[in-house]
Amino acid sequence: KHQTPNTKYQIPNTKYIYQDNQGLSEARNTGIKNSNGKYIAFIDSDDFINCQVLLDFLGKDDSDMPDVVFLNAVKYDKGRVSYFGEDYQPEKILNQSKVEVLKGLCRFRKFPGSAWNKIIKRELIIREKLFFEKGIYSEDIEWSMRLFNAATTFSYLDGCYYYYRQGRKDSITGTVSEKGIKSLLYILEKNAKMEFNRDISSYLYSFLSYEYLVLLFIMTSKNIACDSDIKRRAYHLRFMLLKSNKLIYKLIFPIITLFGVDITGRILKAIRGNI
């Protein structure tokens, strides 16, 4: 708060905006509304980036300006760098159709739904009103589903771009809370009502299915007592597993139907890392 106003005078083409703390979503939305560049990147306050990767991309011909550009990220902890373990495969993104790109992303065990590991064409964000929903946790998931449904062209930049600082406690699986569970449940219910394009529907439902299993997993946390309404709503969302393109998700559907969300959540916790 105290150093940023001084920093702005040292960095050219920088716009400094101050607003009272209204949460991450509103901070991003304010940035979007006040932006005027070709692309928008989202950087969390405790992380940092390799600016040269962006400069190399922006120096390219304007005729090749995709809607979304995927970027590599690494974990950073006290000067040490480690990899996430799942890197983008350029051949599954570059010069590929939207269907093939989403198909390639489905190979990830986790849904690549973070806002910070990609840059997005500003024109697309404004046209499709891709603002972040305020008042919820896991807003990146909700936003990414709308982004993937709206975008048509994709690309990939090689090189280490984003340094994700370790030791953070803001992940939904790292800090479980009642609001976190209700937020994820709300996001899943909202997307369950969306009409996705038929040719990409199964891939988007695979992303949702992963988050659905995360929901069942965190609902079994010892410090959280989920009421019957939350369990009922979670149970009714199991149909998403059948709409995904992954066999393992489809096989979990009858387990939930037979044993319910409580026992299934405990099973998922026992085999964590293998789904």
Language-model regions, residue ranges each:
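Acidic donor-binding segment of Leloir-type glycosyltransferases
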Residues: K1-Y18
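Glycine-rich, basic loop-to-helix element that forms the pyrophosphate-binding segment
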Residues: Q19-S35
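TPR repeat positional signature
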Residues: R28, S209-Y212
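Catalytic core of nucleotide-sugar-dependent glycosyltransferases
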Residues: G159-R168, G174-D199, V214-L241
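All-alpha amphipathic helical-bundle segments outside canonical DNA-binding/catalytic cores
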Residues: D199-F207
